[in-house]
């Protein structure tokens, strides 16, 4: 199937827009030591902030379901409004409280925009091509880390701590205009408009949908156990500063780019279920070998490369899989999928800091164990083909 030029323009533009808010979402971890110092926050406090951010995000489906009730474009625009407000807050409220508000609002923006745009492509792209298309849009996640985060580091290092947030504010406003101009107004007729309660009821009555949400929960919990502490681990072990931490982000971003490219290339061919299984099993192995590769900087970078490659392949393969589980409530299920990911990150954040004093190896082993739970849940995910 050859995609129309208009669809390609929407794919590319949505990828760039997602790169902007993903940069805001991802910049925190590699520059965590610098941000902690700048906002006078300790590891325990920032861990609780991450947990609060993710747990507040668990209510995001109420907001994100707007894509089912008011249209996909409305959901995307609402997400960019939240993002712009979040960056505006920290520019004018440069305190720990302002930083927490930024964390929450940028996460809510992601949680509202992302299911809306994924549901949009789920509506117009056949299931047997959806892995290819969504794999391309997910490149925004790795672009944020190996392009966006180093740019943030440059502004942070050469200008000041607030400069990156001002840049993100400008880009957020431009992104709003891009969505407004390139995506069609698609508000469903009032007579056919589903209610939030109806759609959520469909999800919670579906064992397959609940299993899919559990897979996402476990994958993200496992990843966050490493995500929260890897910057501190590199800093504690090797004394890496801003530029070197930005380099680490580039290494991880390249790994994720390869993982996303792998989804576009092979997930539709081998089946989404098999792709997720391969990715999660690979991440189990990567988690277990990561602590043993931390004797040198390059060894640590290589271990992180494999860890994020396998994680990204598994989580991006989950997206087209979930779009086919419950087509009748696709937008609401995708919203709950993002909420499940946020809940997983919240749980992982709560567990990461208490585990780290025992050694980084404890975080890695715990991540492997939780990934095994994801594999168990995957057995119960059944797709309703709608291609």
Give each language-model segment a name.
Residues 1-5, 184-212:
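Juxtamembrane intracellular "pre-TM" segments in multi-pass secondary transporters
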Residues 28-29, 210-249:
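Extracytoplasmic gate region of multi-pass secondary transporters
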Residues 51-64, 250-259:
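Central cavity-lining transmembrane alpha-helices of secondary-active solute carriers
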Residues 59-94:
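Conserved MFS/SLC helix-loop-helix module at the cytosolic interface between two early adjacent transmembrane helices
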Residues 60-71, 260-271, 356:
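Helix-to-loop junctions at the C-terminal end of transmembrane segments
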Residues 104-140:
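Cytoplasmic helix-loop-helix junction between adjacent transmembrane helices
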Residues 273-318:
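C-terminal transmembrane helical hairpin of 12-TM major facilitator-type secondary transporters
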């Amino acid at each position: 199937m050859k995609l129309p030029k208009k669809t390609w323009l929407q794919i590319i533009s949505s990828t760039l827009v997602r790169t902007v808010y993903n940069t805001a979402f991802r910049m925190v971890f590699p520059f965590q030591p610098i941000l902690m110092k700048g906002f006078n926050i300790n590891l325990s406090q920032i861990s609780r902030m991450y947990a609060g951010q993710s747990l507040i995000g668990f209510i995001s489906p109420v907001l994100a379901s707007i894509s089912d009730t008011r249209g996909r474009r409305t959901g995307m625009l609402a997400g960019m409004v939240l993002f712009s407000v979040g960056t505006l807050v920290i520019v004018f409220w440069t305190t720990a409280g302002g930083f927490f508000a930024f964390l929450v609002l940028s996460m809510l923006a992601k949680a509202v925009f992302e299911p809306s745009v994924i549901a949009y492509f789920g509506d117009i792209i056949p299931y047997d091509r959806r892995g290819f298309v969504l794999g391309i849009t997910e490149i925004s996640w790795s672009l944020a880390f190996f392009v966006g985060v180093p740019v943030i580091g440059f502004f942070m290092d050469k200008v000041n701590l607030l400069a990156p947030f001002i840049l993100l504010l400008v880009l957020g406003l431009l992104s709003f205009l891009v969505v407004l101009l390139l995506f069609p107004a698609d508000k469903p007729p009032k007579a056919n408009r589903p209610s939030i309660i109806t759609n959520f009821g469909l999800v919670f009555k579906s064992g397959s949908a609940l299993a899919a949400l559990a897979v996402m929960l476990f994958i993200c919990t496992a990843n966050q156990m490493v995500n929260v502490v890897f910057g501190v681990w590199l800093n504690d072990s090797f004394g890496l500063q801003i530029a070197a931490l930005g380099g680490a982000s580039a290494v991880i971003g390249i790994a994720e780019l390869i993982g996303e490219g792998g989804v576009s290339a092979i997930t539709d061919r081998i089946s989404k279920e098999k792709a997720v299984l391969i990715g999660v099993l690979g991440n189990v192995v990567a988690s277990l070998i990561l602590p043993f590769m931390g004797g040198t900087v390059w060894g640590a970078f290589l271990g992180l490369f494999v860890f994020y490659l396998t994680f990204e392949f598994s989580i991006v393969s989950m997206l087209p899989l979930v779009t086919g589980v419950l087509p009748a409530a696709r937008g609401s299920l995708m919203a709950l999928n993002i909420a499940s990911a946020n809940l997983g990150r919240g749980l992982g954040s709560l567990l990461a800091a208490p585990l780290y004093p025992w050694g980084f190896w404890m975080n890695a082993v715990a991540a492997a164990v939780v990934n095994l739970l994801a594999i168990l849940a995957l057995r119960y995910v059944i797709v309703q083909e709608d291609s």
